[in-house]
Amino acid sequence: SSVYDVLEEKFIENGDYEKLPGNQQTLRNYIHYLEDSGQINREPEHRRIYDYVFDTPPGEQMLIDFGEETLSKTSHIHFICLLLRYSRFLCVYAQDHKYNSEEACKAIYHSFCRLGGRPKELVIDQDAVFVASETYGEVIKTRVFEDFCTEQDIRLWVCNKADPESKGPIENSVGFVKKNFFSARKVTCIDDVWRSLPGWLERKNQRIHRSTLRVPRAVYDSVEKSAMRPLLPSVYETSPNTF
């Protein structure tokens, strides 16, 4: 699907979308033919584990995790994935350096603005961007993140280091971005990502999710959107909304 997505992107850019030959299944059949005939190598299949369908009420949880894509020895793309657990609607933001607490809070708030509401709870791991320390199960948030959670009146669930049931969907999303977005594109700088990422996200949120077998955008619009809490003002409200 990553290869077909790039083809879609190119045909859309050129204004020739109607001339795009075949569909995803056509391309998939052709790739299988090339693999079976030995013209290209078949990649080993990595089955995804720990992803559950509608395991929380709509509007309840947003899962957050970070990813990194290496372009060269000195160049890296850092991205943050924000996933609504119920609908599997995905938001992704990227930049050319590691996220700090303020930048992460800005990305979270921008995802709220894009969705038109905020969930009741954020699910994170013990990343230093969010968590300053943990002692005997007591989590001490970074000052910036503590202020943001208070400002947005939002609960926090910090996953244990080995908690695949809770982290599975968002870890799968990080892997999906790396495999489906980055692997099929020649990315040389952050501008390449900013140029292609919004359109890619729009298309992916309107396709059937492999775990839920439903379309994230449709589930969000028809069910989850009405369960989201209203937006609140934020100190990040006027921050530049870049990818």
Q: Where in the sequence are the language-model features?
A:
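Active-site-proximal acidic segments at structured loop/helix or strand boundaries
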Residues: 174-243
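DNA-recognition alpha helix
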Residues: 2-18
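Mobile-element integrase/transposase regions
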Residues: 25, 29-91, 99-107, 150, ...
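Short, basic/hydrophobic alpha-helical segments
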Residues: 102-123
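Acidic/histidine-rich, metal-coordinating catalytic segments
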Residues: 117-137
